[in-house]
Amino acid sequence: MKRLYIIALFVFAGGFASAQENGNRDAQNRIVRGPYETNRFFDNVFVGVAGGVNLYFGENDSEGKFGKRLAPAMDIHVGKWFTPSIGARVGYAGLQAKGWTSAGTLYAKSADGGLFREKFGVMYLHADAMWNFSNAVSGYKESRTWNFVPFVGVGWARSYGNDAHDNEIGFDAGLLNVVRLCSSLDLTLEA
């Protein structure tokens, strides 16, 4: 019975979703794709700020309490859409990480039942290439409510604390779910 309800939900939801996408169609009801007018450098620029919680996964972190592993996180980025489907951004992600280790390390402090608590700063300066899948498949529509944007990137990852630091090259990939709130403000859920 549950399956029947779920299937019915998807069938009916699909009908409503397609009914909302008619603003970028021509007289024959085909999706309009380009040509796109190019713009000046500072057109289609965006800025993002986010906050959250970091949860560090290390070798012995399952031994420590969950609440003591949570640390503050921050994300700031600036980007530009070059076409309705292709964009790029540069940004900072990080702030702090907490965890547990079985041996004294550069970032470890006090012992707790044979384990050492670690607390250190983290930062990731990165550049990402973004592809707006919604615009690529369904054509550009300025008033679209939801955009699905996969991205890949590369950057500099740094951990620091207790007079020690570590630098690495990092790679990232993810998905942006962009929900339009008004013409100048979006809510973005990033995974």
Would you name each region that the model predicts?
Residues R180, S184-A191:
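Solenoidal tandem-repeat scaffolds enriched in leucines and small polar residues
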Residues V53, K80, W131-N135, N177-V179:
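Residue-level signature of outer-membrane beta-barrel architecture
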Residues S62, M74-D75, K80, Y92-G94, ...:
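Outer-membrane beta-barrel domain signature
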Residues Q20-G79, G161-A164:
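Short glycine/proline- and aromatic-enriched beta-strand/turn motifs that initiate or cap beta-hairpins
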Residues V47-G51, V78, I86, V90, ...:
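Membrane-embedded beta-strand positions of outer-membrane beta-barrel proteins
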Residues M1-D26:
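Bacterial Sec-dependent N-terminal signal peptides
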Residues S85-F171, L181-S183:
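Gram-negative (and chloroplast) outer-membrane scaffold detector with strong preference
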